[in-house]
Amino acid sequence: MTRSGFVAIAGRPNVGKSTLANALVGAKVAIISDKPQTTRRAIRGIATGEDWQLVLVDLPGVQRPRDVLTTRMQRRVERELDDADGCLLVVNAEQGIGPGDRFIARLLGGASVPVVIAVNKIDRVTRGRLAEVLTDAAKLDVGDDVFPVSARTGDGVRALVDHFVSLLPEGPFYFPPEQHSDQPEEILLAELVREQVLARTTFSSSSSTSTLIACGSSSRVAASAFSRTSSAICASTGRSLRCSGGK
């Protein structure tokens, strides 16, 4: 009998949710940036084993709503959590447990599904510091299990996958085993372009960027960017995108 289910990945901005989602899936399904609000839509990554399938929903960073965009993103997070079979709360070992983590823990406190905490970026802290953060994570009082992991090196990732597989309900696969994401090709391409825009510009927030991919017999790439960059941003076709905006 196969097991399958949906696991929502929650956490405040920039704790490494997208990097961890990519590590769990074993393929790049979510873009990565050090700028807030990089993940603006719920992205589904699909990890499949011989008799199990985890559909990982990489949620936008959870924070107290401050504007229309974050309010809409927050509502999407809440809807995805309602449909999940489990939840992974990601915290940052470097930064430790802060008010944002406690805010999310309170949101998840009433969840009807298992909640697991992943302390990410353990490769960047000492053993003594890690022990402190693991203790603080357990005090969040949400979920019974805390896993130290490094999405960058892969340490602890296999143990985390095995644990979630043990929690999955029995059921058929939702997607073909070879599929890693439910995102259409044009969306995946647009996100990859946006990742490069964010990497090469001086945006303080990723909410100022957008990309559009038009797929057809001759693919076109367009990006709207309102910042200055000293390097060209290239699409997979090799054509550079022209930056426009203020000086």
Where are these regions (language model features)?
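Long, well-ordered amphipathic alpha-helical subdomains in the mid-to-C-terminal portions
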Residues: E178-S206, R220
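C-terminal effector/interaction modules appended to NTPase cores
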Residues: M1-F6, P13, S206, R220, ...
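Conserved G1/Walker A P-loop phosphate-binding module
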Residues: M1-C87, V91
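Low-acidity, Ser/Thr- and Arg-rich intrinsically disordered low-complexity segments
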Residues: T202-S244
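Conserved Switch II/interswitch segment of TRAFAC-class P-loop GTPases
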Residues: L81-F103, S112-L130, R152
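Canonical P-loop GTPase G-domain recognition
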Residues: V113-V116, D123-S181
